[in-house]
Structures are given as C-alpha cells and as structure tokens.
From Swiss-Prot:
It is found in: Nucleus. A motif (Nuclear localization signal) lies at residues 36-48. Its main location: nucleus. Residues 1-52 are annotated as: Disordered. This is Septin and tuftelin-interacting protein 1 homolog 2.
Length: 752
C-alpha cells in the first residue's frame, strides 16, 4: 500500500509532447484531469491491437487536433487548459451580470405591465428615452485627440422596443452558442492583408483619373483635415479609433504607403512623358525626312529650271525668240513646276527677260492716236507676271508697265494733249484702265491729267471763249471725282467775274451756269445765285410792267428761265416781293372799273399758265393766286373790296425804301472811302478786277501768316499792319498792288 498509495509521477510520452493536452484528454477520457490513475487489473486478459488500428487512431487524433493557421483561440501547450477554464468561469459570471440585459429583467417587465412601451415620457412622448450617455476617456488623452468620439453605444440598450429586444436576444443567444472557451481566444476583426501590384494600383488610379483629385477640407472635428477624395474621408477616423494602439506607428505606415504611391505615380508620369517625348521626336524625325525629300526634289527642279533659263537667254541673244514664244516657255515652266515658280519668283526673271522686247515693241508709240497698240501682248503677260495674293505695291507686272507704258503716256500727255479736247486722253485711259495697275493709273491722273486740266481752267476766259467750260471739264467728273474740288473754286471765281457785268437779257450765261448746279455743292451754288443772279432778276422784275391791254412778257420769261437753276425759296421770295404786288394792284383797279368778267378770268388763267409747274405748285405762290381769285369773287358778288396790301404795303414799301437807301449809301461809302473794306477784301477786289486768282496755298505758312497765291506770285496779307508782302528769290518784301501786278506779268513773261 505504501508504494501504491504514493502519487505516481506521470511521465510525458511522445504523444504528449506532440499533441499536448488534447491527446491526453482523449486517451484518458474516463478519468478526470487531476485524478490519480487507476491501478491495472492484471486479471483481465491483455488486448492486442494491430498496426492498422493504431495508425487509424493516430490519424483520427491528428485530424481532431488540427489547428487553423489563422485560429489563435487555442494555446499549443498544456498550460492553456487552466487559462481556458478560468476564462470560462469569467464568461459565466458576465452572463449572470447581464442576465437582465438579454432576458428582459423584472424592472422592464413591471414597466411593460403598467403600459410602458419603451418610448419617451410625457403626454406626447417627447421625453428622452436614455439619460445622458458618457464614455470614459483613455488615460492621458486630451480634448479632440485623434478625433475621439465622445458618444459611443447607448447606455441602456434594454429600453428599446420589445420586438427589437426579443430579436436582439435571439441574435445574442445564437452568436454565443457553442464553446465559449474557443471563442474567447479568437482574434476579433481580423484584418486580412491585401497586396496589389504597381500595375493594379495604376489601373485603379487611371479609373479614378490622374490629376483629378479634389482638395477636400474636413471641418467637422476640432481641427481641419485635408483629404484628397471622399473615399478617404473616413479613413483616418477608422485608423484613429480609441481602441487602436500606437497611432504614431500607424501614421508612419500610412506615410510610407502614401510615399510609395506617390513614387509609383511619379514614375508612371515620367514614363508617360518619356513616351510622349519619344513620339514627338519620332514625328519630328519623319518631318525632317519629308523636308529633306522635298528639298532634294526642289534642288533637282531648280537645276532643270536654271538650264531652261540659260537656253532662253541664248535664244534671246540670237534674236530667235519673240514675246509670244517667251511667254509660252514661262507658261510651261509655271504649269510644270508651280511651287518652284512661286518660290523662286520666276516672274521677276520673266519680266527682266521680256523688258527689252517690250521696249522694242513700244518704241515710237503715240498713245493718243493709237491707243490699242500692244494691248494684246500686255494682256497675255499680265496673267503670267501677276502674283496671286500679293498685296505689295511693287510687282513684276507693275514694274514692266511703269518702264514701258507710263513714260510714253506721260510724254504724250504733257507735250501733245490739249485739255479742251478731252476725248483722246479719255479714250486712252478707258482702253488701258483694266491693263494698268491701280497705282500707275492714279499716277497718270495726278501727274498728267489733273495739272494740265488745272492750267487750262486758270487760263479760261469766259467772255472771250465760245466753248463752255463744262464741255471739256464735265467728262472728267467720273474719272477725277473729288480731285477737282480745287478747280471748282477757280471756276466759281471765273463765274463771278463774268456775272459782274451780266444782264438778264444775255441768255448765254444760263447756258454756262446751269450744268454746274449738280456739280457744285448746294451751299456754294446758293451763294453764287444769291450774290450774282438774284439781284439781277430782282431788277428785271422791278422794271417789268403789267398791262392787260398790251402785255409784253419778254422780261418775265427771262426771269422764269432761271426757275430750274435758282433755288425755289429764292425764286418764291422774288415773286412775292416784286411781282405779285404789281399783279394784284392791276387786278384791283381793273375790277373797280366794271369790266367784263370773262376777260378777267381769261387774263387770270393766262398768267397762271405762264408759271412753270415747279413754281406754280409752291404753296406760297398758290396763296397769291387765291388772293386774286377772292378779289374777283367779291367783285362778282358786289361786295366791298379792299385794296390788296394796303396796310401791309405801307410798312413793306417803307422798309424796302429804307433798305435801298442804306444799300446805295453803303455802296457810295465804299467807293468814296475804300478803307471801309477789309484789307483782304480790297486785295481780292483788285485781283477780280484784273481777272487774277487770289487763293491760299494749303499747309504753307510764314511767321504765322497764311501764304496766298496772287497769279504767279506768292504773297502774305498782314491785315494787322495793312501790309502786302511778296516773295522774290526767297526773300519777303513789302509791295503795293501795282508793283504786285507787274511782278505777276514779269513771271508770266519769264515762263513763256
């Protein structure tokens, strides 16, 4: 008994060393873990097991004891048995403490029996269900550290609805079903590591879009946070949970990951840039290849063109080449090598080669007598030499025309052309207008036609010449246009000299003046009529006598002949002031003598018919005729007639007599005392008397005074000092009017 009563120390077998307490519990399932091993009963027979049975048992034990690589709930040593038993005891105690939580305690049952449904207190159930929920902060954690959440799980989840409570109980029981010892040592929320390659990462970024990250500022916490996308908005919150240990280490890991991501993105960006650079270099290489090929083709073409030009020069030197054949040779070159023709400016070479042939063709040409000479040759070369889309002034064709055509036209226009015979020059310009460049055409007008025409206008004498000036000036209006404005001033001055001594009986003046109504501007024409024509017509109407018995209408018809030329308001004013007062007065006296009304009506209608339509349709003229008709009606009805204009004419005649007397006095004063005229007016009057022109020179000043042209002499009018200065040999000296006139005649004689 002594030896058998002792506790025999159990030896560790090979299976215990391999399988631990699991194998022990299986082999000693009949005994308790700490009990003494029973004695062997030697009376029973020995049992033998075959090798196959032993292997089967070992395999079964190994299969039952297989541990998952990711399962950390069971310790691989025998010590874990005691630890697991203690953990199982703690779990039972926790279940007892939370019994009311999962089974619905007596307090909740009593409240339910009294009608409480788990909602807020109050009539409208507006009270809070749970009291203020608090949560203990971890040790040494300040306010706002790692976005710590102040509010976590509800303090009393048992206050939920009964249905939710029952459901939660079922779920809780089902979740806690099984062996608690194994669940206690299992890691919860195991994070599986996910590995991605650089290609997968770049593919993911490509789906999101490179460079499309938005800068998002999160202001929900005590401190602002900057995130790149909404995907990462809650990433840091999860990473900085209060239950997570070592946030600095996790921050460093995230920093390393982000650095790797940035490195991958930078490498990918550099790779894409290098690929783009390689592609652009390849394209540039192809471009250079095409340029080299094009230059080689151009070089070959230029060699052929140079050889062709050398052959053309040899043929020209031998005299075997004409203008037509030369033009055909260059047309072939332009059609065969259009790019080379334009690039090398072969039109200039063609123009230089054709110039001697054109000079030979137009040698001795008279443009005024034979305007169409050589126009066909010029037309063919115009198409060959003109460069398309060339806005420059100097072109090969314009240079050719300026050296061949322009000199001949200039010589013929200056030496041969007579301005009073405009047809030859007009025919020449009309024939060559389409062939001449616009610049050369304007040069001919400004340097040949206009100066020659201006000299002819200045030398025109309207009293001596029988051909009106508009015969040889008006044909140039469509061609010269506004360039004749300076000549119009000279023509108006010539008209003024002519009209000073004009009488209305001279109908030739109307023939000379009327064509210029549409040429001069309205203000200049009205001024000319008011100054020279209207006063003479006024005198004619004043001298006109109205006699029903023996009426002479010659003077009246002379006045009516100017209706189309004189502005209508001036002519109406003349008739109201100087014709109708006489006419109404004669009608009044005739009606007072008991006449025959048939004769009066015939006389009335006859006078009305003598007025031109444009004048009789005027409202003011109609009023005057209506006054005469009213007088006749009063006489027929035996009504008392008032003398026409009795009251108005008294003041009118007085005012008229006063104006006439003042006018005569003014004229007499000017004759008696010429100093009443301004200094400039006196010089102008002297120039008009001598039929000379006094006009300012545009943009010519000397010591602040305008320089005028008196005939052929340059003068200065110093009105402040009443001095007249003339220029001779570059010097200015004072002169009188007679000396100035002698200087003009001397200049004319010197030119002749």
């Amino acid at each position: 008994m002594g030896d058998e009563g002792k506790k025999e120390k159990r030896r560790q077998t090979k299976e215990d060393a391999v399988y631990g307490f699991v194998f022990e519990s299986d082999s000693n399932s009949d005994d308790s873990g700490g009990s003494r091993r029973k004695k062997r009963r030697k009376t029973k027979p020995v049992k033998f097991s075959s090798a196959g049975n032993i292997d089967q048992v070992l395999k079964q034990n190994r299969g039952n004891c297989k541990i998952d690589e990711n399962d950390d709930t069971i310790l691989p040593i025998a010590l874990g048995k005691k630890i697991a038993d203690k953990a199982h005891v703690r779990e039972k105690n926790n279940k007892k403490e939370n019994f009311e939580k999962f089974s619905g305690g007596i307090g909740m049952k009593l409240l339910e029996k009294m009608g409480y449904k788990g909602r807020g207190l109050g009539k409208n159930q507006q009270g809070i269900v749970a009291p203020i929920e608090v949560q203990l902060r971890p040790k040494n954690m300040g306010m706002g550290y790692n976005d710590f959440k102040e509010k976590n799980a509800p303090l009393f989840p048992c206050l939920n609805k009964v249905e939710e409570k029952k459901k939660s109980v079922v779920v809780t029981v089902s979740e806690n079903h099984g062996d608690g010892r194994r669940d206690l040592w299992k890691k919860k929320n195991v994070r599986k590591e996910v590995y991605i390659t650089a290609e997968e990462f770049l593919g993911k970024k490509q789906e999101e879009g490179f460079g499309c990250d938005q800068l998002i500022i999160d202001k929900r916490g005590p401190q602002d946070r900057v995130v790149n996308s909404l995907r990462n908005l809650y990433a840091e919150e999860k990473a900085t949970d209060a239950n997570v240990q070592q946030p600095e280490l996790q921050h460093n890991l995230r920093f390393i990951v982000k650095s790797l991501e940035h490195g991958i993105l930078k490498t990918d960006k550099d790779l894409r840039n290098e690929k783009g650079l390689a592609l652009s270099l390849q394209q540039e290489k192809e471009k250079f290849k095409m340029g080299v090929k094009k230059q080689k083709t151009l070089f070959d073409n230029l060699g052929y063109v140079a050889e062709e030009i050398d052959r053309i020069e040899v043929e020209i030197a031998s005299g075997n080449l004409t203008l037509d054949s030369l033009a055909n040779r260059f047309k072939d070159l332009r059609s065969s090598y259009p790019d080379d023709y334009k690039c090398c400016n072969l039109s200039c070479i063609a123009s230089s080669l054709a110039l001697p042939l054109f000079i030979r063709m137009f040698q001795g040409w008279d443009p005024l007598s034979d305007a169409e000479h050589g126009i066909e040759a010029i037309s063919s070369w115009k198409m060959l030499l003109e460069v398309e889309d060339n806005q420059s002034i100097s072109t090969p064709y314009s240079q050719l025309v300026s050296e061949v055509i322009l000199p001949a036209v200039r010589v013929s226009g200056i030496n041969t052309w007579e301005p009073r015979d405009p047809e030859p020059m007009l025919r020449l310009l009309e024939t060559w207008e389409k062939m001449l460049p616009s610049l050369i055409f304007e040069t001919i007008l400004t340097t040949v036609v206009l100066p020659k025409l201006s000299i002819a206008i200045e030398s025109w004498e309207p009293r001596l010449e029988t051909v009106p000036i508009h015969f040889w000036v008006h044909p140039w209006l469509p061609v010269l246009g506004q360039k004749l404005e300076s000549a119009y001033q000279i023509i108006r001055m010539k008209f003024g000299n002519l009209l000073d001594a004009w009488h209305p009986s001279d109908v030739s003046v109307h023939t000379i003046l009327s064509p210029w109504k549409t040429v001069f501007d309205a203000a200049s024409w009205e001024q000319l009529m008011r100054r020279y024509i209207v006063p003479k017509l006024q005198v004619a109407l004043q001298e006109f006598q109205i006699n029903p018995a023996d009426q002479n209408l010659d003077e009246f018809n002379l006045v009516m002949g100017w209706v189309s030329s004189v502005p209508i308001h001036l002519m109406t004013d003349l008739m109201e002031r100087f014709f109708f007062p006489k006419w109404l007065d004669v009608l009044y006296h005739w009606l007072c003598s008991e006449p025959k009304f048939d004769e009066i009506m015939k006389w009335f209608l006859g006078w009305k018919g003598t007025f031109p339509q444009e004048l009789s349709a005027n409202r003011r003229i109609e009023i005057q005729f209506k006054r005469g008709l009213d007088m006749a009606r009063e006489a027929v009805e035996r009504m008392e007639m008032s003398q026409p204009g009795a009251r108005e004419n008294i003041s009118y005649h007085k005012a008229q007599e006063q104006r006439q007397s003042e006018g005569r006095a003014k004229v007499q004063a000017q004759v008696d005392d010429p100093e009443e005229l301004s200094f400039k007016e006196a010089v102008e009057l002297f120039a008009q008397e001598k039929e000379l022109l006094l006009k300012p020179k545009p943009h010519r000043m000397h010591n602040g005074l305008q320089i005028y042209r008196f005939g052929n002499v340059s003068v200065l009018l110093d009105s402040a000092n009443s001095k007249l200065l003339a220029q001779e040999e570059g010097r200015w000296f004072p002169v009188d009017l007679d000396s100035l006139l002698k200087m003009h005649y001397s200049a004319v004689t010197g030119k002749q």
